[in-house]
Regions:
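Proteins enriched for Cys/Gly/acidic motifs involved in redox and nucleic-acid/cofactor modification
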Residues: 7-170
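Short, small-residue-biased leader/transition segments that mark boundaries at the very start
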Residues: 1-5
Length: 170
């Protein structure tokens, strides 16, 4: 996955918060991003007020989902504005469809990751750590499989298996 994935020493002890919105495919993408971040030194926290970095994985299938995504981003952006967290990454459908508007309207956003670029989460983190904003909308370069790190967020007795990429609700 490249050199940027191996530079974890200076990330040890940093906390990561996350919000996953939308379908089961989005949840699997979130779990894999969490796995990549954990493998690179981040500790996962459910308390956003403790997080150094927050990832919001969004959905825009229906207008209500789009509104929920925007409201969630605005709530999370407040942590950055208050100086609680140092980085805000928005991933998923909303960032894919509205990248220009999001960067313009919500300056607290540090990185946007499209629906096909979840595997590039560490590239976005590296940019943030160097004081840069990034917008990664590439097609997926690594297809998810069981060897990729994944932090399961569902109860231990159930997990989603992702068999396709992208949104099949639209």
């Amino acid at each position: 996955l490249g050199d940027v994935y191996k530079r974890q020493g200076y990330r040890m002890g940093k906390k990561l918060g996350y919000v996953s919105l939308g379908c089961a495919k989005n949840l699997v993408d979130t779990e894999v991003m969490l796995g990549l971040l954990k493998d690179n030194g981040y500790t996962i926290t459910e308390n956003l007020s403790e997080a150094d970095l927050i990832v919001v994985n969004t959905c825009t299938f229906i207008e209500k989902a789009k509104a929920e995504s925007i409201n969630t981003i605005l709530e999370v952006a407040q942590y950055k504005e208050d100086g609680v967290c140092k980085g805000l990454i928005v991933a998923g459908c909303l960032s894919q469809q509205y990248q220009d508007e999001l960067f313009k309207e919500i300056p607290e956003i540090d990185a946007l990751i499209g629906t096909g670029a979840w595997d590039q989460i560490m590239v976005a983190v590296d940019a943030i750590e160097h004081g840069n904003r990034s917008c990664i909308m590439e097609n997926i370069t690594n297809i998810y499989d069981e060897r990729m790190p994944r932090i399961q967020t569902t109860p231990r007795y159930s997990a989603y298996v992702k068999i396709a990429e992208g949104c099949n609700n639209g």
